[in-house]
Structure formats: structure tokens, C-alpha cells
């Protein structure tokens, strides 16, 4: 069943909605429902920012959440886009399948696609990138209320020694898995199943998976 209505006027635009008009010519060689099945690969456009860009996705989500310009760390995010994401060809291609995904989860997925992380810095919504960090200061005894304590966790059999990254291939649009292994341990005993959103390239999925595997071995 369907409900129909006659519109008194024809709209010329639909704000915040992308529309498409198709003219399809069918014949008796098509199945009954084939003329109604249309696949579309759409490119996400951002106002004032490059399409598919990680920074553009950041700003789009933050603005949609109600963040003002003075609450966003534009300098840091733009620097990451200019120095890392754009030169390395890193983009974010993902759409939410339901309304149950929180804004924080989406921001974290955007950052993961750029080998980074979302954070709040000095009250601003910002992003960081994993890697070697410059020291930012020293801790002196005058600033401590008790003795400085450090902790170290050694490798154990409970740690992952392999990572399988599942992503959606941009050519087949099917889920595929890349295996991330160390050359000295091609048959790991404990493998992590990691789902990567927003990445459609197998090389990028492999690099992100290997970074994750390196953290399990060397980041203590």
C-alpha cells in the first residue's frame, strides 16, 4: 500500500539533502524489479573543505553536535591535514548505519582513519597523531606530593601477537580482511579481530593494523 498526494508547488531545492534525478528506459529483457534497483557511489562534500577529507569530516560532525568555532582547535587539525593526511592520501569514507552511534564514537573513527585519536585540549575539541612526541616539560620534586612511581608490564601470552583487520573494499564493496604479522612470528597464537571504519584501501588497512600490532609488542 502507498499514500499519494498532489503537491501545490514544485520545490527547487531541498536544504541539507542531496537529490538525484534519473531517466531510465526499460524493456522486456529486464527483470520485473531491475529498473528500480540503482546503486550510487556518492562523494561526501563539505562546505569550505576538501571532499572526503579527514579534517572536513571532523568539522562537519563537530558543527552538527553544536560546537562553536571558539571550541574547535582549527590550528592543530588543519596542521595534521596539511602535514600528514593530505600528503599521505588519507581520507575518511564512512556513513552511519543507524542513529545509535554516538558523536564521540564517530569522532574516534574519523581519527582512527588518520592514524590518530580524538581528544580535548585546553577545552578545545582537537586531534592528535600517534608517533614520537617531543617532551613538553619536566617533573621536579617541588611539584610532587609523594615519591614518583613508574610501572612496567612485560610481554605475556595474553598479549596479541597478530592482528586481522576487516575493512570494506572500495572496488568490490565487500568486507575483506588483511592479516598483519611479524616476520619472526608468521603463525601467532592470539590474533585480534579489528574492524576498521572509513578506510577502503587494503594498503592503508595494513599499515594501520601493523601500527596496532607494533603497539602490542613495544608500547609498554
Spans of model-derived segments:
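Surface-exposed interaction regions enriched in Ser/Thr/Asp/Glu
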Residues: 1-67
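C-terminal extracytoplasmic interaction modules
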Residues: 47-220
Amino acid at each position: 500500500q502507498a499514500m499519494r498526494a498532489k503537491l501545490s508547488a514544485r520545490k527547487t531545492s531541498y536544504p541539507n539533502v542531496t537529490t538525484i534525478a534519473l531517466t531510465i528506459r526499460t524493456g522486456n529483457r529486464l527483470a520485473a524489479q531491475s529498473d528500480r534497483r540503482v546503486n550510487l557511489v556518492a562523494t561526501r562534500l563539505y562546505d569550505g573543505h576538501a571532499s572526503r577529507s579527514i579534517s572536513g569530516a571532523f568539522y562537519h560532525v563537530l558543527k552538527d553536535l553544536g560546537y562553536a568555532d571558539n571550541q574547535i582547535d582549527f590550528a592543530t587539525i588543519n596542521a595534521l591535514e596539511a602535514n600528514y593526511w593530505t600528503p599521505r592520501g588519507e581520507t575518511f569514507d564512512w556513513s552511519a548505519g543507524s542513529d545509535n552511534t554516538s558523536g564521540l564514537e564517530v569522532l574516534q573513527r574519523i581519527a582512527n582513519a588518520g592514524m590518530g585519536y580524538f581528544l580535548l585540549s585546553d577545552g578545545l575539541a582537537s586531534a592528535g597523531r600517534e608517533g614520537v612526541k617531543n617532551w613538553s616539560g619536566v617533573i621536579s620534586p617541588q611539584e610532587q606530593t609523594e615519591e614518583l612511581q613508574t610501572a612496567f608490564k612485560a610481554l605475556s601470552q595474553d598479549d596479541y601477537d597478530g592482528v586481522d583487520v576487516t575493512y570494506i573494499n572500495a572496488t568490490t564493496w565487500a568486507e575483506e580482511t588483511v592479516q598483519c604479522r611479524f616476520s619472526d612470528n608468521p603463525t601467532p597464537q592470539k590474533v585480534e579481530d579489528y574492524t576498521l571504519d572509513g578506510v577502503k584501501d587494503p594498503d592503508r588497512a595494513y599499515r594501520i593494523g601493523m601500527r596496532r600490532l607494533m603497539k602490542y609488542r613495544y608500547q609498554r
